[in-house]
Regions:
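Conserved histidines in hydrophobic membrane contexts and catalytic metal-binding motifs
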Residues: 1-410
Length: 410
């Protein structure tokens, strides 16, 4: 009874989310190589002559005059290439400018975020709006159910061999089971660590962490403001944290950078969006351990916040670490290759599942009978409570199963 129930829900979960998991596998693999893709797409715009850089204030003024827009963010890369500047037009439209730091020329303009932003939005389906992002969140929740039920089914007949030929059902069953057994743990890790980016669950977690002070550094006493839409340049734990506000006045970006020298040589600078807002620097790093954010009072040049990874609480450190591993950055190239292998395994699971199901369907074994066992029901209820959007679709799936059973009994 339990095995039939687990198999039924493993199949139901797969039918719900296989296309989305395939999408996540392909776009996730591409995102792992976002740096290489960006350098290939923008090769002409990134190449600059090696020479001393102009003062940041001069660069900002030059880019503003050339684009007719206000520079809101400056990113200095670690490589000797063009700087990136985000500019905001009077109508609110934002674009990304590639700038030669040696003379201030704009080498190219593209949409805000560039190709990296496109890959990120494709991966999360945010490019389609809130509905698409919600579907990806649902898929990630169901992926957790798929992996756990799949492990249980495989454990009933543990085998890591592939027998027969592709013409037989056994080949595809063995291929699916062996792939899931070998790669399932990493797929489960990706599903869980990807949740903090989701639109509903992720924002809820982020708001909770921010509101309760669980993990993010405590902001200094005084007035606080938002990030003016630039929170994505910060570590996840600080993207909705209030920033300390200072007095009126502006010392300029060069003096602000001089005050924040400890942030390193590769950084993102967010310029004050409103009077009293600080200059906000975030180190461009790969490892979560190297995260560093510095806020400089625009009026006085005083450092009003200096937050490093060690200043985060255990909860925030765990989330930041998970995100860095998820992106294949925390442990260098081996980390990226493991994540790439997980994407390949997930894609193989997505392809083999419908083939396996179709080959058993003509024999009358398409959807196994049986309800939901008590233990499995409690597990799914817990998963549904933890991930509400997934829980709603679980209820819908349960309703469909009940209807099918009722129709089959007539």
């Amino acid at each position: 009874m339990l095995q039939r129930a687990v198999w039924r829900w493993h199949l139901v979960a797969g039918l719900f989310v296989l296309p989305f998991l395939g999408w996540l596998a392909v776009t996730g693999a591409l995102y792992l190589y976002k740096t290489e893709i960006e350098r290939a797409v923008y090769a002409e715009w990134l190449s600059v002559e090696a020479r001393p850089t102009l003062p940041i204030g001069t660069l900002v003024a030059s880019v503003g005059a050339e684009t007719g827009a206000r520079v809101v963010q400056v990113a200095r890369p670690s490589a000797p290439e063009a700087w990136r500047m985000t500019v905001a037009a009077p109508n609110g439209t934002r674009r990304l400018a590639f700038v030669d730091p040696g003379d201030g020329r704009v080498l190219g303009l593209t949409r805000a975020g560039g190709i990296t932003g496109v890959l990120r939005e494709l991966h999360s389906l945010a490019i389609t709006g809130p509905i698409g992002n919600a579907l990806i969140e649902i898929a990630a929740g169901w992926a957790i159910v798929l992996v756990l039920t799949g492990f249980w089914l495989w454990a009933q007949r543990p085998r890591l061999t592939v027998r027969g030929s592709p013409n037989g059902r056994g080949f595809w069953r063995d291929l699916h089971g062996s792939t899931g057994a070998l790669g399932g743990a990493v797929v489960l890790f990706l599903a869980i660590t990807g949740m903090p980016w989701s639109g509903v669950w992720g924002r809820g977690l982020q708001s909770l962490v921010t509101a309760q002070g669980w993990g993010r550094p405590t902001a200094p006493a005084g007035e606080h403001g938002g990030h003016g839409g630039h929170g994505a340049a910060l570590p996840w734990s600080m993207q909705h944290a209030a920033m300390p506000m200072g007095g009126a006045g502006d010392i300029g970006p060069d003096r602000a950078l001089a005050a924040a020298r400890g942030v390193g040589t590769a950084w993102t600078m967010t310029l004050p969006a409103t009077p009293g807002a600080p200059y906000l620097f975030s180190a461009l790093v790969a490892r979560a351990d190297d995260a560093h954010v510095v806020a400089v009072d625009a009026a006085s040049g005083r450092i009003v916040q200096d937050a490093r990874y060690a200043d985060f609480g255990a909860g925030a450190r765990a989330i930041e670490w998970g995100i860095a591993v998820h992106q294949g950055q925390q442990y260098g190239e081996p980390n990226r290759l493991v994540m790439l292998a997980a994407c390949a395994a997930l894609l193989l699971l997505v392809v083999s599942a419908p083939v396996m199901w179709w080959r058993r369907r003509p024999r009358g074994l398409g959807m196994p009978p049986g309800g939901t066992g008590r233990g499995l029901g409690l597990l799914m209820a817990a998963a549904g409570a933890a991930f509400p959007l997934t829980g709603l679709t679980m209820l819908a799936a349960l309703g469909l199963v009940r209807v099918q059973g009722w129709l089959g009994g007539r």
